[in-house]
C-alpha cells in the first residue's frame, strides 16, 4: 500500500472516530466528562482529547468552563436546523404530537430509525399528573425495544428484521434479556397482525406504550409515533382507542410527507427544464 493510500485510510479513520464522538456527546443532554467519553468510545485518552478539540474548533462541540463537561455546539444546531428543511419529519409531526397529547393527556413521542437503533426525536407532555419517564428526547434503544421502536422494526421486510436482530443480539442479551431475538420476532408478528405495537411494561415496570410506524410514499420506514402511560391507563378498551388515534395522526403525517416529496420533485423538474428552455430556438 502506497503512502497516499495510507494517509487516506488514516484520515478516513479519524473522521469516523470524530463523528462517533460527536454522536455520543450530542445525545447526552447533561453533557459528558472526558473520562466518560473515553469509557463509552473505547478510544484512548489522548486520541479522544485530540478529536474533541478538533470538534470544538469546528463549533460542533463545546466545553463548559465551569464543570468541564462537553456539550453539543452551536454549529451542530445550525446544521441541524438547515437539515430539517430536507429531513423535516419533526416539523411535519409537531401538530399531530400536540393533538395526541391534548386528546389523551399522556406523553407522546416521535422516534426515527438510525441503522439498527431507534432515536427519540421529541417528547410531547400530556396533562395527566402521573407520567412515565421511560423515554426522553435523545434516548437511543436497539430497534424493537419500546413501542415506537417495535413499530418501526415490524414495518421492515423480514430479511431486514433478521439483519437488525442479528446485529443487536449481543446488546439485547446484555441489556434487554427479556427481549431476545426470538421474542422480538414473535412481537413483530403480533404487531403486524394487530396493526400497532405494544410495550407491556417490559423496559420500565408499570410503563406501557403503544406505537404506530410512519411510512414514506415508497413504503419505507420514516419513523414512528407512540404514546406512553402508566399500566392502568393502557388496558383495553383504551389501548385500542389510542391505537386508532395514532393511526389517524400517522396518516396525516404520511400525507404531509407525500406532499413534501411531490413538491420537491416538481421543483427539481422545473430546475432541470429551465436551462433546456433557454437553449431552445426562438
Describe each model-derived feature in a short phrase.
Residues 1-86, 90-91, 251, 255-259, ...:
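N-terminal helix-turn-helix
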Residues 262-282:
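Signal-transducing coiled-coil/dimerization helices and immediately adjacent hinge/linker segments
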Amino acid at each position: 500500500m502506497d503512502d497516499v493510500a495510507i494517509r487516506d485510510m488514516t484520515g478516513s479513520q479519524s473522521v469516523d472516530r470524530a463523528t462517533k464522538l460527536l454522536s455520543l456527546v450530542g445525545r447526552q443532554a447533561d453533557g459528558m466528562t472526558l473520562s466518560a467519553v473515553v469509557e463509552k468510545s473505547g478510544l484512548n485518552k489522548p486520541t479522544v482529547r485530540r478529536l474533541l478539540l478538533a470538534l470544538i474548533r469546528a463549533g460542533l462541540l463545546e466545553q463548559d468552563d465551569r464543570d468541564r463537561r462537553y456539550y453539543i455546539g452551536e454549529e451542530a444546531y445550525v446544521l441541524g436546523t438547515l437539515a430539517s428543511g430536507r429531513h423535516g419529519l419533526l416539523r411535519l409531526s409537531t401538530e399531530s404530537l400536540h393533538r395526541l397529547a391534548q386528546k389523551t393527556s399522556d406523553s407522546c413521542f416521535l422516534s426515527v430509525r438510525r441503522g439498527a437503533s431507534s432515536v427519540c426525536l421529541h417528547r410531547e407532555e400530556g396533562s395527566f399528573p402521573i407520567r412515565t419517564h421511560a423515554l426522553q428526547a435523545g434516548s437511543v434503544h436497539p430497534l424493537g425495544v419500546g413501542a415506537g421502536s417495535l413499530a418501526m422494526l415490524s414495518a421492515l421486510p423480514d430479511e431486514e428484521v433478521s439483519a437488525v436482530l442479528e446485529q443487536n443480539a449481543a446488546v439485547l442479551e446484555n441489556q434487554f434479556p427479556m427481549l431476545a431475538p426470538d421474542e422480538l420476532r414473535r412481537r413483530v408478528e403480533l404487531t403486524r397482525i394487530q396493526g400497532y405495537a405494544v410495550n407491556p411494561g417490559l423496559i420500565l415496570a408499570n410503563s406501557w406504550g403503544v406505537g404506530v410506524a410512519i411510512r414514506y410514499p415508497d413504503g419505507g420506514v420514516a419513523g414512528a409515533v407512540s404514546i406512553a402511560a402508566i399500566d392502568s391507563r393502557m388496558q383495553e378498551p383504551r389501548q385500542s382507542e389510542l391505537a386508532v388515534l395514532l393511526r389517524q395522526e400517522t396518516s396525516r403525517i404520511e400525507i404531509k410527507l407525500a406532499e413534501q416529496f411531490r413538491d420537491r420533485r416538481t421543483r427539481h423538474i422545473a430546475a432541470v427544464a429551465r436551462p433546456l428552455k433557454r437553449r431552445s430556438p426562438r
